[in-house]
């Protein structure tokens, strides 16, 4: 399962965690993804969707 929303394409973002002493360590921010049953092209499918798309009503749940 890819860490990407199937509706909007939101995915992992990479960057640095910066400590108080200004040391940079690599880290990643993950989207809040949920597996939901939704109606896609008239059929019920299980898709990976971010919670932003769920709250905004871009997904018709089955």
From Swiss-Prot:
One of its GO terms (molecular function) is structural constituent of ribosome. Pfam families: Ribosomal_L28. One of its GO terms (biological process) is translation. The keyword Ribonucleoprotein applies. Signal peptide: none annotated. Keywords: Ribonucleoprotein, Ribosomal protein. GO terms for cellular component: ribonucleoprotein complex; ribosome. The keyword Secreted does not apply. It comes from the Bacteria. Transmembrane segments: none annotated. Belongs to the bacterial ribosomal protein bL28 family. HAMAP family: Ribosomal_bL28. This is Large ribosomal subunit protein bL28. The lineage of its organism: Bacteria, Bacillati, Bacillota, Clostridia, Thermoanaerobacterales.
